[in-house]
Curated annotation (Swiss-Prot):
Record-annotated disulphide pairs: none
Subunit structure: Homodimer.
UniProt keywords, alphabetically: ATP-binding, Ligase, Nucleotide-binding, Purine biosynthesis
Source species of the chain: Vibrio cholerae serotype O1 (strain ATCC 39315 / El Tor Inaba N16961)
Sequence ranges assigned to domain ATP-grasp in this UniProt record: 97-287
UniProt protein name: N5-carboxyaminoimidazole ribonucleotide synthase
GO biological process, one term: 'de novo' IMP biosynthetic process
Gene name of the encoded protein: purK
EC number per UniProt: 6.3.4.18
Function: Catalyzes the ATP-dependent conversion of 5-aminoimidazole ribonucleotide (AIR) and HCO(3)(-) to N5-carboxyaminoimidazole ribonucleotide (N5-CAIR).
Domain of life: Bacteria
InterPro entries linked to this entry: ATP-grasp, ATP-grasp_carboxylate-amine, ATP_grasp_subdomain_1, PreATP-grasp_dom_sf, PurK, PurK_C, PurT/PurK_preATP-grasp, Rudment_hybrid_motif
Pathway the protein acts in: Purine metabolism; IMP biosynthesis via de novo pathway; 5-amino-1-(5-phospho-D-ribosyl)imidazole-4-carboxylate from 5-amino-1-(5-phospho-D-ribosyl)imidazole (N5-CAIR route): step 1/2
Amino acid sequence: MRVLVLGAGQLARMMSLAGAPLNIETIAFDVGSENIVHPLTQTVLGHGLEQAIEQVDVITAEFEHIPHPILDLCARSGKLYPSAEAIKAGGDRRLEKALLDRAQVANARYTMIRSRDDLTSAIAEIGLPMVLKSALGGYDGKGQWRLKEPTQIESVWQELAQYLAANPEQAIVAEEFVAFDREVSLVGARNLVGDVVVYPLAENVHTQGVLSLSTAIDAPALQTQAKAMFKAVAEQLNYVGVLALEFFEVQGQLLVNEIAPRVHNSGHWTQQGAETCQFENHLRAVCGLPLGSTKLVRETAMINILGEDQLPAEVLALEGCHVHWYGKAKRSGRKMGHINVTADYSGELQRKLCQLATVLDEKAFPAVHAVAKEIQP
């Protein structure tokens, strides 16, 4: 079985690693260079996209911001999973919000903005504070503004106006500000015949809009809510593959914040913490194979490595620590890799996070230090 991944970053890399034991060969399309490359070595392979489409059995995607002509070309082959519709919804907040409404899953109240009058109407309808998000191209906290006070309206509008003028296809989604208790996410998979499996919820900690720490949690009531919402969205799309839903938890109730039609950063913990990791289950789903068990096998936390290309030796020396590097050139704030920390029980996992806080730099790993201070104030 041969799979073409649209995108050639770390998610394609980890899909390739997960596919090898199943005798699934992966190649990747680098959207920037428009080359077909090997996902691990980045070696350029000697054929173009159209030839690659003909030579593979399945096409999938590692991220949602793929040019629509490329998605449409792949969709015409009948080999693209998830569908172009699903991938496009993940890359456009207007489509995403419409999808959530059709699926009848709870999400923050919103309206669309293209003009100063639209902003005035949005403030009257939703009230302040509000969060303003770009419809296209926003991820990891980019393309977002927070409007808290009436005195900010003109200055924020000036920024929005410049942003909109630079891209005629752009729009702004105005959402009510949600005072959430915590952020959680659910990663699951749906296959060609409609079977669904979901992993345990993960509690997520973000730093400046970027995921820093993700921990698998046992929350039965929330898990039931999240699974029902996952199924509603997946069935609305007739989805095939791994799908992630990010939620705000507010007094025991969940609101969908975003969807990601792909394997997801908050699911990386499954590589060591679940019986079948998200990358393998994605390939199983899109290749027509039975889905694997999502059972938790060890208490697990995932720590993103941001902007660092080296770690202290003590990290690998700690029992239950697994490091995954992405092979990227070092750049400030860039996702360079992640650490999966596993333990037999939650208290042991907390102890290990505290140990890691003693050797990891607080500036680079603020979430680990914050958790350690909560555990051992």
